Amino acid sequence: MQANVQAITEAGTSRFVTVKDGDTEFRIHCNDTGAGAETVVMLHGSGPGATGWANFNRNVEPLVAAGYRVLLVDCPGWGKSDPVVNAGSRSELNGRVLKGVLDELDIERVHILGNSMGGHSAVAFALANPQRVGKLVLMGGGTGGPSLYAPMPTEGIKLLNGLYREPSIENLKRMMNVFVYDASSLTDDLMQARLDNMLARRDHLENFVKSLAANPKQFTDYGSRLGEITAPTLVIWGRDDRFVPMDVGLRLIAGIPNAQMHIFNRCGHWAQWEHAKAFNRMVVDFLGN
């Protein structure tokens, strides 16, 4: 199925949804586009200045063209969504908030693409709401826990945490230089836009640091529960990921019964951006078959 796709912009797809998590009310920002019968949700990672649009702007149009409604969600504590200091499981908080967003929008069942933290959050949602998940695509994330490939926290995570504490263009460049395999693709304009996003919400930066102090293990290790996931799952990883080592992806396909894995060479932690064309073809094919 192919749909006519007009120019899709961040501003033209922006909307807000109010959800409750226990006694707490969150105003959640989303980008919502496409009119397909099936919905694809995209969940971003935990980097400073991350948003649904910043993470996935190279991936929206191909999915809309393939006939899907696409929903990018800014998790609490990122982008235009409300701030939060989180002392529990960030994965499960995001999963609960996603359920609230889908309930408010009257969307019963979704496919979920999750990058890094978004992968952890997708797994949390799938475990809590198995009947509401079609398929999962997990990139550079899906569970917390140990790695045999690299000591934890990894080089990239140390740089990410340092950037939260001292947000500057120099620290941003240090992090982004190990975030992707080929840093020459990171233009000055892209770097400045990311820095501007960060500095526009200093409350998010400060709250992330406070959250880590309250609970250093923000992301749950779901290793013992992966066998409960019934959704067909595509795990995508960069061979050169210096944030979340590749053996975390191997743990996912070892645990999830109906899972497959694709590994991109010359790819860091941002497969959907670094290898966008191949990634988009792969995801459209996986969701459609």
UniProtKB/Swiss-Prot annotation:
The record marks 194 as: Catalytic role in ketonization of the dienol substrate (substrate destabilization). Its EC number is 3.7.1.14. Catalyzes the cleavage of the C5-C6 bond of 2-hydroxy-6-oxononadienedioate and 2-hydroxy-6-oxononatrienedioate, a dienol ring fission product of the bacterial meta-cleavage pathway for degradation of phenylpropionic acid. Homodimer. It catalyses: (2Z,4E)-2-hydroxy-6-oxonona-2,4-dienedioate + H2O = (2Z)-2-hydroxypenta-2,4-dienoate + succinate + H(+); (2Z,4E,7E)-2-hydroxy-6-oxonona-2,4,7-trienedioate + H2O = (2Z)-2-hydroxypenta-2,4-dienoate + fumarate + H(+). Pathway: Aromatic compound metabolism; 3-phenylpropanoate degradation. Keywords: Aromatic hydrocarbons catabolism, Hydrolase. SUPFAM superfamilies: alpha/beta-Hydrolases. The active site is at residue 269. InterPro entries: AB_hydrolase_1, AB_hydrolase_fold, Epox_hydrolase-like, MhpC_alpha/beta_hydrolase. The gene is mhpC. One of its GO terms (biological process) is 3-phenylpropionate catabolic process. Belongs to the AB hydrolase superfamily. MhpC family. The record marks 116 as: Transition state stabilizer. One of its GO terms (molecular function) is protein homodimerization activity. This is 2-hydroxy-6-oxononadienedioate/2-hydroxy-6-oxononatrienedioate hydrolase. GO terms for cellular component: cytoplasm. Pfam families: Abhydrolase_1 (PF00561). PANTHER family: ALPHA_BETA-HYDROLASES SUPERFAMILY PROTEIN, HYDROLASE.
